[in-house]
Amino acid sequence: MQAIKCVVVGDGAVGKTCLLISYTTNAFPGEYIPTVFDNYSANVMVDGRPINLGLWDTAGQEDYDRLRPLSYPQTDVFLVCFALNNPASFENVRAKWYPEVSHHCPNTPIILVGTKADLREDRDTVERLRERRLQPVSQTQGYVMAKEIKAVKYLECSALTQRGLKQVFDEAIRAVLTPPQRAKKSKCTVL
């Protein structure tokens, strides 16, 4: 059985731990508790292949900036997360998370994940953002960011409703099992 290490990164409170708890237990945790999810191992089938999926949660808060990279060695795939209702967390994908993971693991595939998809249409959420002259991150913005950071895929999900949740992890596994073909560069040969 092939083992795959999947590390989840992103700003504090974007829903990384909820994503993992909801996926692994099929239940949404009640209140926000900064990262307490232990590394978790799940045996799953993707495209008829048995996979041992190791899930590593990380703390997004700045206090952990020096500690977090200790979980990066031997990572097979990163989930870089932001909350669709938090434009600042989206900007930090470009400003912080992509630079950090690409520095430590330059050839490791990235899946860009927009969390809290259920809040994009939530009236209270939209109103709170509007009061600050902001709006939820659009799907188009997500696709543009994914291209910019060379992510294998851009996906949106809700840990609360579980919409798109399984797909996030299935696509993370596929990114490792069937890496995208790199464009072949012609090599210069001097004779």
Curated annotation (Swiss-Prot):
Q: Which GO terms describe its cellular component?
A: cell projection; cytoplasmic side of plasma membrane; cytoplasmic vesicle; cytoskeleton; cytosol; membrane; neuronal cell body; plasma membrane
Question: Disruption effect?
Answer: In the second generation, there is defective mitotic spindle orientation in the EMS and ABar blastomeres which results in disrupted left-right asymmetry and failure to undergo morphogenesis. Due to defective apoptotic cell clearance, embryos accumulate apoptotic cell corpses. Distal tip cell migratory defects. Double knockout with unc-5 RNAi suppresses the distal tip cell migratory defect in the ced-10 single mutant.
UniProt-listed CDD domains? Rac1_like (cd01871)
Major place of residence: membrane
Example of a GO MF term: GTP binding
Subunit-structure text: Interacts (GTP-bound form) with pak-1. May interact (GTP-bound form) with mig-10 (via Ras-associating and PH domains). Interacts (GTP-bound form) with chdp-1 (via CH domain); the interaction facilitates the localization of ced-10 to the cell cortex.
Protein name, entry field: Ras-related protein ced-10
